[in-house]
């Protein structure tokens, strides 16, 4: 899908192949950094590795987080949701989304700084979401039944930052990146079935091998005691989480 912003001429949602045609140097840097990591034989997420190899990844590049930048992201995300509806279960049509932010869009030094920025973005998206919160999904981040929703779709938002030094699987290069997938897709490919549990175990064993520290204490599956919001932004150390989710649900 190739959606053009008529005012700026910038493509909102672009394919992996189209990134090479971009006139923005930082877009090429993002693609190169992501590719360098996903091409590593030990990178834990086998689905991301496969998607990159097959050029299935979609991209949204965000220049700023002012109103114009958030609107640009929201419109691209709406296109991604439309693309992802009625998925047929074929991994060849499972398109992960990488949302990359320019270095000028963010002033952060620590993992917590980057996470705060990520939650600010998700909050702003929620506040301009054109659709009601997804039915059956809790509006309380401290509920196991909560996840981020936008345009009527449940989403999982993986925050990756250059400040993640030990948790290498959450560092995709110089830029802050959100890797977004429809949450319910995980129920299909890695759900609570014998095959799904085997896939999750394999990926988490790969995390232990790839990262400089053991897998996060907060990892889990949706609907269990593990909270989704804590898994969006994993700390660079294994400690009990005492912080609160900054996301606040707003009634329409």
Residue spans of the language-model regions?
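"Short basic amphipathic alpha-helical interaction patches in structured regions
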Residues: 111-118, 170-176
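Compact mixed alphabeta submodule
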Residues: 163-205
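Structured loops at beta-to-helix junctions and adjacent beta-edge loops in soluble globular domains
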Residues: 102, 151, 158-160, 181-183, ...
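Short, flexible beta-strand-to-coil junctions
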Residues: 91-95, 99-107, 162, 183-185
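Non-catalytic accessory regions used for complex assembly or targeting
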Residues: 1-92, 106, 116-132, 190-252
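Aromatic/basic-lined ligand-recognition segments
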Residues: 136-174
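Active-site ExK catalytic segment of metal-dependent nucleases
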Residues: 60-63, 118, 158-160, 179-181
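Short, charged/polar micro-motifs that form catalytic or ligand-binding hotspots
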Residues: 63, 67, 99-112, 143
């Amino acid at each position: 899908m190739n959606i053009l912003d008529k005012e700026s001429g910038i493509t909102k949602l672009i394919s992996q192949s189209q990134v090479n045609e971009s006139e923005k140097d930082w877009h090429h840097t993002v693609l190169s950094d992501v590719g360098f990591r996903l091409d590593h034989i030990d990178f834990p997420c086998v689905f991301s590795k496969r998607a990159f190899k097959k050029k299935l990844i979609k991209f949204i590049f965000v220049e700023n987080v002012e109103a114009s930048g958030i609107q640009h992201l929201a419109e691209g995300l709406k296109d991604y949701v439309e693309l992802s509806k009625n998925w047929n279960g074929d991994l060849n049509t499972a398109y992960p989304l990488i949302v990359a932010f320019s270095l000028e869009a963010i002033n952060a030094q620590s993992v917590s700084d980057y996470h705060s920025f990520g939650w600010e973005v998700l909050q702003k998206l929620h506040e301009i979401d054109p659709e009601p919160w997804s039915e059956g999904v809790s509006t309380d981040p401290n509920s196991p039944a909560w996840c981020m929703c936008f345009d009527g779709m449940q989403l999982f938002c993986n925050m990756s930052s250059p400040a993640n030094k030990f948790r290498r699987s959450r560092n995709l290069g110089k830029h802050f990146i959100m890797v977004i997938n429809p949450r319910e897709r995980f129920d299909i490919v890695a759900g609570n079935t014998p095959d799904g549990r085997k896939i999750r175990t394999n990926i988490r064993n790969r995390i232990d091998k790839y990262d400089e520290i053991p897998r996060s204490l907060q990892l889990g599956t949706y609907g269990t005691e593990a909270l989704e919001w804590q898994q969006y932004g994993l700390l660079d150390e294994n400690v009990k989480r005492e912080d609160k989710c900054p996301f606040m649900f707003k009634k329409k």
